Amino acid sequence: WPVVLPLGVLEYHGEHLAVGMDTLAVIKTLDILEREMDIVILPPFYYGASSYVVEPPEGRGSLHVGAQVLFPFAQEMFTGLLRIGFRNIHFFIHHQTENFTVGMPTDLAFKFAARQAIFAFLERERGEGWWGRAEMADYYARQKGGNDPFNWIKGHPLMTDETIRNYPFDHAGVGETSLML
């Protein structure tokens, strides 16, 4: 079964929305998805890099945890999941994902941690020099067929580029408020 982490931040979204709505939107979506397919939903992680660019934290509730702190946590978590035996790990985020390909601090920390965890895990399991061995000569052919250990952990925005193009989207406005309703 896929293992899924709801990932988000505690960020002020005005008086009309809950602090943490970015994570709550992911949790609700995964609850709906769980009715349609078998997945393991990990406890949500709310403590991302929210920043204070919209409002200062005082009296608002935003809690910023820097990417430099998120990275070691995420790397340890992913390493633990790999050691358990999971090979289909996903995190979904709804915070600053309007340009997910380029990335923002929270998702970049988790993406980098995923790569580092996989590299370290493979080196631990296969030994140093594993990628340069003869049995890896067909790596790129296997990769095209989907057999790639670097696909064991993937990050996803809650809303695809197409969804964002087709529906009004904003920060704490009509789009995000509608998402919470």
Show where each model-derived region lies.
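Extended, histidine- and acidic-residue-enriched regions that form the cofactor-binding/catalytic faces
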Residues: 1-181
